[in-house]
């Protein structure tokens, strides 16, 4: 009886330990996945600087294209698509954090006019939902619903990202007006070269921090190198650490200069930004335009009928 109780107690403890481990794993994974995409959120109140530069360019140093497509005009309280395209060669592989090669990821930030925001799920049509796929968008800040971010997500599947946007209604929001508004977008493909704290990632070139002779190159067990440079002037030893990923360009005994590249530049990605314009159209103005066009068409029809009637009268008088 005692043995059976001990077995039950051990079984209960093992089950509890497994459950706790799973919970910790899930929570950790969730926090990492939620925090990782938006490095800029931690350091910048607004992703667009006063100069117009989007802050993602501070970490993604290479310049690459990005494209945005929106309707020319939208009516109030209407859901529309903002399509962001982040083109790149799908055959390319990037250096991952562990130094291995892998597929590129993409990300985007969409800066909408005040009042525009992500459409609620119950307002999104099945057609737009199909284009969205499994993407999950979030606001840059809880109080900045007009700034949306996404990523990183697999580039091979989401090089074209469809944002479902809800336009504001000036009838309910008095600070919104029927005007032409700018929309800004930034999009990156691949990992960045600089982390928010200013340190380098392994997806960039590493330069010599001193001039002299490469006296020793030590290949580290987990990848990467320790390069010892002997300063020719005072014999001082300087050690440069190269993480796994970049390919080494120098060899032992080689004379190098300060800031000379020690590695290749493995970066194949980059960041780009663009803009578009959209008009929040007054429905009454549209109705007025339609009424005007209808009036013009009717006037043309009456003129044609009147002309034909006049021609008939003239013809009858000539016959008489």
Swiss-Prot record:
User: What family is it from?
Assistant: Belongs to the cytochrome f family.
What interactions and quaternary structure are annotated? The 4 large subunits of the cytochrome b6-f complex are cytochrome b6, subunit IV (17 kDa polypeptide, petD), cytochrome f and the Rieske protein, while the 4 small subunits are PetG, PetL, PetM and PetN. The complex functions as a dimer.
The residue range of the signal peptide is 1-35
The cofactor required is: heme
GO MF term set: electron transfer activity; heme binding; iron ion binding
Per UniProt, heme binds at 36, 56, 59-60
Where in or outside the cell?
Plastid, Chloroplast thylakoid membrane
Q: Which domain of life is it from?
A: Eukaryota
Main localization, broad class: plastid
Q: What is the protein name for this chain?
A: Cytochrome f
Question: What keywords were assigned to this record?
Answer: Chloroplast, Electron transport, Heme, Iron, Membrane, Metal-binding, Photosynthesis, Plastid, Signal, Thylakoid, Transmembrane, Transmembrane helix, Transport
State the membrane topology.
Single-pass membrane protein
Q: Which InterPro entries match?
A: Cyt-f_TM, Cyt_f, Cyt_f_lg_dom, Cyt_f_lg_dom_sf, Rudment_hybrid_motif
Q: Which residues cross the membrane?
A: 286-306
Q: How is the cofactor bound?
A: Binds 1 heme group covalently.
Extract the SUPFAM superfamilies matched here.
Answer: Cytochrome f subunit of the cytochrome b6f complex, transmembrane anchor, Cytochrome f, large domain, Rudiment single hybrid motif
Q: Which GO terms describe its biological process?
A: photosynthesis
Gene Ontology CC terms: chloroplast thylakoid membrane
User: Which Gene3D superfamilies would you find in this protein's record?
Assistant: 2.40.50.100, Cytochrome f large domain (2.60.40.830), Single helix bin (1.20.5.700)
């Amino acid at each position: 009886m005692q043995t059976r109780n001990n077995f039950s107690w051990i079984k209960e403890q093992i089950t509890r330990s497994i459950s706790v481990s799973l919970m910790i794993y899930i929570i950790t994974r969730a926090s990492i996945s939620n925090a990782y995409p938006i490095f800029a959120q931690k350091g910048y109140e607004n992703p667009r600087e006063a100069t117009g530069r989007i802050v993602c360019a501070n970490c993604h140093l290479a310049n690459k294209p990005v494209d945005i497509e929106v309707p020319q005009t939208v009516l109030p309280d209407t859901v529309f698509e903002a399509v962001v395209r982040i083109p790149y060669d799908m055959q390319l592989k990037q250096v991952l954090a562990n130094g291995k090669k892998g597929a590129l990821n993409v990300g985007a930030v969409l800066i909408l006019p005040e009042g525009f925001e992500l459409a609620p799920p119950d307002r999104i049509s099945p057609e737009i939902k199909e284009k969205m796929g499994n993407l999950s968008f979030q606001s840059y800040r809880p109080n900045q619903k007009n700034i949306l971010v996404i990523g990183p997500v697999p580039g091979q599947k989401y090089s074209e990202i469809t944002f479902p946007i809800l336009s504001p209604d000036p009838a309910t929001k008095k600070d919104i007006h029927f005007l032409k508004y700018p929309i800004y977008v930034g999009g990156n493909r691949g990992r960045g070269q600089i982390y928010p704290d200013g340190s380098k990632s392994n997806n960039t070139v590493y330069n010599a921090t001193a001039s002299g002779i490469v006296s020793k190159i030590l290949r580290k067990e987990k990848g990467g190198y320790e390069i010892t440079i002997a300063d020719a002037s005072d014999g001082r030893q300087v050690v440069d650490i190269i993480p796994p990923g970049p390919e080494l360009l120098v060899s032992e005994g080689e004379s190098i200069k300060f800031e000379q590249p020690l590695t290749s530049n493995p970066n194949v990605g980059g960041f780009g930004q663009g803009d578009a314009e959209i008009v929040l159209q007054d429905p009454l103005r549209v109705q007025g335009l339609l009424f005007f066009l209808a009036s013009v068409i009717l006037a043309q029809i009456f003129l044609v009928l009147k002309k034909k009637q006049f021609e008939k009268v003239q013809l009858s008088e000539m016959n008489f």
